Amino acid sequence: MLEVAQVNFIGRKEELNTLEKEFRRDGSFVVIYGRRRIGKTTLIKEFIKDKQAFYFLATEEVESQSMKRLAGVVARVTGNSMLQRVTFTDWLDLFREIANYRPEEKKVLVIDEFPYLVKTNAAFPSILQNAWDEILKDSNVMLILCGSLISMMQKLSLIHISEPTRRS
């Protein structure tokens, strides 16, 4: 489980309820976007605090470093320290590790600041779509993408922080 610092969480009950409903569905893929500093990450951390969650904060770095850091997140959550010593060269392998971990249990994969991954690799949205279609959709994983680059996130437009909608 992800450790979350004690924060006075105020409001956003409607958004939390929407996320909880999505969590109970099979094949749930959610995008949360909005301006910077409006509480997107705080909302997500509040939502995942009592769940099996893989929280990954993307940064501006080379793609191999992002894969290495996500492997570290997966290693920490699964307790499989060997994953930190593996050099992943394919995002799909990392997503398989997440899907295959305790397959009977519902999990949440959060990619926060998603646009940074796209900036590093313009093909990342199609890689993620492939991962969703081939690996994650039929597994016990809820996928949450979050970002502040509104134009990019609107293209994915699955859920807006103040106007929830569902992707079929």
Positions of predicted regions on the chain:
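N-terminal pre-P-loop "Q-motif" helix
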Residues: 8-19
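Conserved lysine of the Walker
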Residues: 40
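Hydrophobic positions on the alpha1 helix immediately C-terminal to the Walker A/P-loop
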Residues: 43
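Conserved NTP-binding/hydrolysis module of P-loop NTPases
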Residues: 50-54, 64-83
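Short glycine-rich substrate-engagement loop in P-loop NTPases that contacts/grips substrate
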Residues: 77-101
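Conserved P-loop NTPase "ATPase switch" module shared by AAA+ and STAND
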Residues: 98, 102-124, 128
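Sensor-1/coupling segment of RecA-like P-loop NTPase cores
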Residues: 120, 130-159
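Single conserved hydrophobic/aromatic residue that forms the stacking wall/gate
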Residues: 159-168
